Amino acid sequence: SLARLVRPFILRRTKDTGLKELPPRTEITLQAELSPAERKRYEDTRLAALAELSGAGEDAQQAGQKRIRTLAWLTRLRQLACHPRLVDASWAKSSAKLDLLMSLIEELREGDHRALVFSQFVKHLSVIRERLDELGVTYQYLDGSTPAKERQRRVDAFQAGEGELFLISLKAGGT
């Protein structure tokens, strides 16, 4: 099978392996209130999804296609909730989540703390990187395009104190 053929080339770490190397996790849940412009964009997209998906009487093939379209719409809504630029490249404003993240990062820096930042969307990490670069925040970065040898070098660099943040895509960092 394809999975058996590619297994030697895929670097995956399980939580059990990684947890031994990490300090205890601190988890804080915060709510980010969308701006009016973000809320409008999200609501417009949600209504467009409902309009497209509200067809009645479908055969099995149409039902399968509808499931695929539903997942695509849900992904688009999740991306909009992260930052509208993930869906609309012309979006020039910030986002509520990015602003909240930047305020948290500032608090971390003031306390001389470091953090791991995970995202399922590499594009979202790219938006975050742009802001961090503007602010002069140092970081390590790892996504699926990072070669295996470079991944370990970046992990080692972060553990040695290089970078205030480590930005990691969930798929590349393991889930």
Residue ranges and their predicted role:
Residues 48-55:
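Cytochrome P450 catalytic domain signature, combining two hallmark sequence patches
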